[in-house]
C-alpha cells in the first residue's frame, strides 16, 4: 500500500487539510491501494506559487538541454514500465496488457518531443521598412496547470507534461482523485529521470471542488498562465469560462459520443472486432469509446448476430488476466453507469450477456473470470433498436454499453453521426 500526498516545491505536503481517504482496488474492494492525504484550494495556490518561483530558472536552461531531460525521462519510464503498469491495473482495474500499452505511450511521447528542443524555431519576417528587421522567438508560457482524468492515468498526463516541460514551463499537475497513486509514481519517475529542479513539476492531490477553487484563486493572483484539462464537458465548460475571464485559452479534451458507420460492403468480422474493442475496452470508460453503431439496414441483422456472439464470448473479469475489460474505475462511475442503464426502454432489444447491471452471484455472467462479488464488474450491454431521439443515443454513457441503429443512405448516416453534438472520434 502506498501513502500518497501532494508534493509542492519538491517536498511532500505533510498535512491533509481536506481529509484522508482509503482508495480501494476496484477489482478487489477489500484491498486498499493507497492511503491518500487530500489537499485543498490553498495547496493548489501554494503549488502554483512554487511553480512561479521555479519557472524562470528552468526557462533559462537551453532548450536542447531540456530535450535531453525529456529523453532521460523516457528511458527511466521504460525501465520501470512493468511496475507502473501493474499499479495502473491495481488502482483503476485496467487490464494489464492495456496498462502496459498506456505506459508505452509515455515513452513514445518522450521520444517524439526530445528532439523538439532543437526545433523551437522562431521566424524572420520581411519588413516593409528598410531599416527594420522582424524576428519572432518561442518563449515559455510560464506556469501551466494540468488537470487530468483517471481512465488514462499516465498516458494522457504525459501529453501535457512532456511538451510543457520541454518548452520551459513549470507545471502544477492535479491527477484524478481516484488515481493519485499512479500520479505520484509518475511524478517520481519524471523528477528522477529528468533531474527536474524543485518546483518545476508539482503534484496536487485534491478533489474537483477544491481544485477548481484553488485554480480560480491562483489565476486571480496571476500565478497560472495556461490550463490544460481532460474530463467531462460540463467541467470543461466551467474551466473554459474561468480561463476566458483571464483572457487565456484553455486546452480542453472533453467527452465524446463516438459513432461507427458499418456500410453494406463492410467486412463484418472486422467491424465486429473493432466494435468489441472500441465499445468495451476499458469497460467503455474512454472518451473515445464507441457509443453507437450506425449500420446499414441491409446488413443490420447479420452484424447484430455476430456482434452479440462476440460480446457474449468476450472475457470479462480479473484485470490481471487476459480479459477484454475489468471493473469500473471507481464506485462513482459505477453509480452513474447504473443511471444510464435506466435509459434502456421497452422499444430496445438488449443483447450481449446473460444479464444487465452489476455482475453478482444472483446476476451472473457466463464465463466470468475471477470473483465478481468483490469488485465493480458490470455486464456488457448491446442496445439494439436505438432511435436518434433516445437519451442513450444523444449522451455519453461512459460504461460497457453500445447502441445500434440503422441507416439507408450515406447522408443519413453522416447526419446520425453528427447529431449528438460531440466532436471527438468516429469510424467507418
Model-based region annotation:
Residues 87-95, 125-130, 206, 321-326:
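Short linear capping/connector segments at secondary-structure termini
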Residues 30-120, 131:
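Glycine-rich loop-to-alpha-helix module at the N-terminal edge of alpha/beta enzyme cores
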Residues 33-39, 54-60, 146, 260-262, ...:
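Short, well-ordered beta-strand elements within core beta-sheets of diverse protein domains
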Residues 30, 66, 88, 110, ...:
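Residue-level signal for inorganic ion chemistry
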Residues 234-387, 409-411, 416:
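ALDH superfamily catalytic-core signature
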Residues 1-36, 68, 72, 120-148, ...:
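Terminal low-complexity tails and localization/encapsulation signals of metabolic enzymes
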Residues 192-197, 313-315, 390:
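Short helix-capping segments at alpha-helix termini
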Residues 122-270, 407:
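Rossmann-like NAD(P) dinucleotide-binding subdomain of oxidoreductase/dehydrogenase enzymes
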Amino acid at each position: 500500500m502506498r501513502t500518497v500526498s501532494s508534493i509542492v516545491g519538491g517536498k511532500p505536503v505533510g498535512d491533509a487539510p481536506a481529509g484522508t481517504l482509503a482508495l480501494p482496488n476496484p477489482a478487489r474492494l477489500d484491498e486498499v491501494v493507497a492511503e491518500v492525504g487530500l489537499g485543498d484550494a490553498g495547496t493548489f495556490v501554494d503549488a502554483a506559487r512554487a511553480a512561479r518561483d521555479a519557472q524562470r530558472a528552468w526557462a533559462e536552461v537551453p532548450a536542447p538541454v531540456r530535450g535531453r531531460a525529456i529523453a532521460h525521462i523516457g528511458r527511466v519510464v521504460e525501465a520501470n514500465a512493468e511496475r507502473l503498469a501493474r499499479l495502473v491495473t491495481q488502482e483503476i482495474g485496467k487490464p494489464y496488457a492495456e496498462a502496459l500499452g498506456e505506459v508505452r505511450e509515455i515513452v513514445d511521447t518522450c521520444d517524439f518531443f526530445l528532439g523538439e528542443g532543437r526545433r523551437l524555431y522562431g521566424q524572420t519576417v520581411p519588413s516593409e521598412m528598410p531599416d527594420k528587421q522582424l524576428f519572432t522567438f518561442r518563449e515559455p508560457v510560464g506556469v501551466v496547470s494540468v488537470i487530468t482524468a483517471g481512465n488514462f492515468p499516465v498516458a494522457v498526463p504525459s501529453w501535457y507534461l512532456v511538451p510543457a516541460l520541454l518548452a520551459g514551463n513549470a507545471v502544477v499537475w492535479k491527477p484524478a482523485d481516484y488515481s493519485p497513486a499512479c500520479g505520484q509514481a509518475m511524478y517520481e519517475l519524471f523528477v528522477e529521470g529528468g533531474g527536474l529542479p524543485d518546483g518545476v513539476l508539482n503534484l496536487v492531490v485534491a478533489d474537483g471542488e477544491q481544485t477548481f477553487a484553488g485554480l480560480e484563486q491562483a489565476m486571480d493572483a496571476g500565478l497560472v498562465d495556461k490550463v490544460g484539462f481532460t474530463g467531462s464537458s460540463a467541467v470543461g465548460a466551467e474551466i473554459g469560462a474561468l480561463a476566458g475571464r483571464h483572457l487565456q485559452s484553455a486546452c480542453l479534451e472533453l467527452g465524446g459520443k463516438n459513432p461507427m458507420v458499418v456500410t453494406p460492403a463492410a467486412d463484418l468480422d472486422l467491424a465486429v472486432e473493432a466494435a468489441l474493442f472500441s465499445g468495451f475496452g476499458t469497460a467503455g470508460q474512454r472518451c473515445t469509446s464507441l457509443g453507437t453503431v450506425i449500420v446499414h439496414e441491409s446488413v443490420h441483422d447479420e452484424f447484430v448476430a455476430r456482434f452479440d456472439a462476440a460480446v457474449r464470448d468476450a472475457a470479462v473479469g480479473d484485470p490481471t488476466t487476459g480479459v477484454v475489460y475489468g471493473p469500473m474505475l471507481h464506485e462513482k462511475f459505477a453509480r452513474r453507469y447504473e443511471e444510464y442503464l435506466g435509459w434502456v426502454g421497452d422499444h430496445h432489444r438488449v443483447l450481449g450477456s446473460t444479464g444487465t447491471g452489476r455482475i453478482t452471484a444472483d446476476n451472473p455472467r457466463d464465463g466470468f473470470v475471477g470473483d465478481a462479488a468483490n469488485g465493480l464488474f458490470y455486464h456488457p450491454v448491446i442496445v439494439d433498436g436505438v432511435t436518434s431521439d433516445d437519451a442513450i443515443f444523444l449522451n455519453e454513457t461512459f460504461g460497457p454499453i453500445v447502441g445500434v441503429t440503422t441507416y439507408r443512405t450515406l447522408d443519413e448516416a453522416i447526419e446520425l453521426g453528427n447529431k449528438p453534438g460531440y466532436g471527438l472520434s468516429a469510424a467507418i
